[in-house]
């Protein structure tokens, strides 16, 4: 998680 929010796998959600 980059933005500290709920993201799917793989993480990375801006």
From Swiss-Prot:
Keywords: Cell wall, Secreted. Its main location: secreted. GO terms for cellular component: extracellular region. It is found in: Secreted, Cell wall. This is 41 kDa cell wall protein. It comes from Nicotiana tabacum (Common tobacco).
């Amino acid at each position: 998680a980059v933005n500290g929010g709920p993201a799917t796998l793989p993480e990375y959600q801006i």
